[in-house]
Curated annotation (Swiss-Prot):
Chain span(s) of sequence motif Nuclear localization signal: 34-38
Compartment(s) of residence: Host nucleus; Host cytoplasm
Further remark: SC35 was derived from A/Seal/Massachussetts/1/80 (H7N7) by serial passages in chicken embryo cells, thereby acquiring a multibasic cleavage site in its hemagglutinin (HA) and becoming 100% lethal for chickens. SC35 was then passaged 11 times in mouse lung, yielding the mouse-adapted variant SC35M.
Any GO molecular function: RNA binding
Protein name per UniProt: Non-structural protein 1
Entry comment, domain topic: The dsRNA-binding region is required for suppression of RNA silencing.
Length: 230
């Protein structure tokens, strides 16, 4: 196993521990708590994949961070902060909408790279809105936290989420996953629209009303793809 992979995991575990202590003091805002919850799942998945104990890794990560801080000057810290581009966290959903459990009568699921696409194929003839929480850097989607499909009544009928065990995805990965989700939902004569935030950063080929134009052949192909891979 590559030593950099192990040390990276150890540092991530310790930094998560620090953030958790911060959150336990009720100092974190909604985006902070959201990322904390997602990163916990990611660390569990990575730990399982690597065969490493999280508690042991956290202690090792603490030693690495302490050594770095001991060698770091205030001036070097200022230069590092100034040179790192800042990302923005954008939210369509409330914390309640993100954490709410939902159930599918006719579940369909597809794994596309490091993203998991889920939808309820029992939903028909509904107006559906796609909402997402994600970070943006250089005016492009950086990391998808969670995307969900909501009916006008507020029911959740679809979802795109990163797989904890496979971190890392591009804005194109997210766009392709959105296309698959839309194709599956529109197959049952649902009308799907995308939030303004998603239109701007993750789905630029939308119509003015926020409804992505998908040809019938593409919709059928996407729906068949989902069914064949479940």
């Amino acid at each position: 196993m590559d030593s950099n992979t192990v040390s990276s995991f150890q540092v991530d575990c310790f930094l998560w521990h620090v953030r958790k202590r911060f959150a336990d003091q009720e100092l974190g805002d909604a985006p902070f708590l959201d990322r904390l919850r997602r990163d916990q799942k990611s660390l569990r998945g990575r730990g399982s994949t690597l065969g490493l104990d999280i508690e042991t890794a956290t202690r090792a990560g603490k030693q690495i961070v302490e050594r770095i801080l001991k060698e770091e000057s205030d001036e070097a810290l200022k230069m590092t902060i100034a040179s790192v581009p800042a990302s923005r966290y954008l939210t369509d959903m409330t914390l309640e909408e993100m954490s709410r459990d939902w159930f599918m009568l006719m579940p369909k699921q597809k794994v596309a790279g490091s993203l998991c696409i889920r939808m309820d194929q029992a939903i028909m003839d509904k107006n559906i809105m796609l909402k997402a929480n994600f970070s943006v850097i250089f005016d492009r989607l950086e990391t998808l936290i969670l995307l969900r499909a909501f009916t006008e009544e507020g029911a959740i009928v679809g979802e795109i989420s990163p797989l904890p065990s496979l971190p890392g995805h591009t804005d194109e990965d997210v766009k392709n996953a959105i296309g698959v989700l839309i194709g599956g939902l529109e197959w049952n004569d649902n009308t799907v629209r995308v939030s303004e935030t998603l239109q701007r950063f993750a789905w630029r080929s939308s119509n003015e009303d926020g409804r992505p134009p998908l040809p019938p052949k593409q919709k059928r192909k996407m729906a068949r793809t989902i069914e064949s891979e479940v």
